[in-house]
Swiss-Prot record:
Family membership: Belongs to the MscL family.
Species of provenance: Bacillus cereus (strain AH820)
UniProt xrefs under InterPro entries: Mechanosensitive_channel_CS, MS_channel, MSC/AndL, MscL_channel
Gene giving rise to this polypeptide: mscL
PROSITE patterns: MSCL (PS01327)
Designated name of the protein: Large-conductance mechanosensitive channel
Gene Ontology MF annotations: mechanosensitive monoatomic ion channel activity
Primary location group: membrane
Taxonomic lineage of the native organism: Bacteria, Bacillati, Bacillota, Bacilli, Bacillales
Subcellular location: Cell membrane
Length: 132
């Protein structure tokens, strides 16, 4: 599954990119809220009350807010995983539809129709010879 995710994330397919942008925009706020309001506090409890967003290194009056960076990476990973799962389900449904189309009996070609007519004529000739 990891290899599939890497292929998905790094291939240059325009449709996958478009789907990712649309789905990412649609679910971005929901996933961000999930991460910010549910997952991060749970991780904070497990890790001893750590809140990633407040993590920083202070140099005098300046601060490096690396906690926000960790939070942003975490948001990205969850959004990317959600998009990946959506595309995987979409591709699976699409491939099932294609398999169903392949199972349908195709219309006979002109050659097949002509060969069928020749077969029928030969049967008629053979049956008329048998009667005579």
């Amino acid at each position: 599954m990891w290899n599939e995710f890497k292929k998905f994330a790094f291939k240059g397919n325009v449709i996958d990119l478009a789907v990712g942008v649309v789905i990412g925009a649609a679910f971005g706020k929901i996933v961000s809220s999930l991460v910010k309001d549910i997952i991060t506090p749970l991780l904070g409890m497990v890790l001893g009350g750590v809140d990633f967003t407040d993590l920083k290194i202070t140099f005098g009056k300046s601060s490096i807010m690396y906690g926000n960076f960790i939070q942003t990476i975490f948001d990205f990973l969850i959004i990317a995983a959600a998009i990946f799962m959506f595309v995987k389900v979409f591709n699976k449904l699409t491939s099932k539809r294609e398999e169903e189309k392949e199972e349908e009996i195709p219309e006979p070609t002109k050659e097949e129709e002509i060969l069928g007519e020749i077969r029928d004529l030969l049967k008629q000739q053979n049956s008329s010879k048998d009667r005579a």
